[in-house]
UniProtKB/Swiss-Prot annotation:
Disulfide bonds: none annotated. Gene3D superfamilies: TCL1/MTCP1 (2.40.15.10). PANTHER family: PROTEIN P13 MTCP-1, T-CELL LEUKEMIA_LYMPHOMA PROTEIN 1B. InterPro entries: TCL1_MTCP1, TCL1_MTCP1_sf. Belongs to the TCL1 family. This is Protein TCL1B2. It comes from the Eukaryota.
Amino acid sequence: MAAAGFYPPRLLPQVLISTGPGFYEDEHHRLWMVAKLETCSHSPYCNKIETCVTVHLWQMTRYPQEPAPYNPMNYNFLPMTWRLASMNTYRGTDAMHWRLLNHSQVGDTVQLILMLE
């Protein structure tokens, strides 16, 4: 049996539009779910003293069939829309910039990791 390998990721989404708390849809109608939301003052992605915010988005092939269990994550500060502003920066509808830290694919899972700048 072959081990799960890393594959070249697909093209970056140009736009991600919120469809509900923790869910976004891109311009190709692909669904993205907030898989992890980190707010901390010490992050492996952040070398600043101030608080860092990173969001991990996973591309899903379809909406979950069952309602999501209670999730303590607060999505209120995430933008309603992200637009790709450059090769490594997304701009939210709130005018905040989010740096692309990672765009990868392992098996069928495509992941984006964004950090608030």
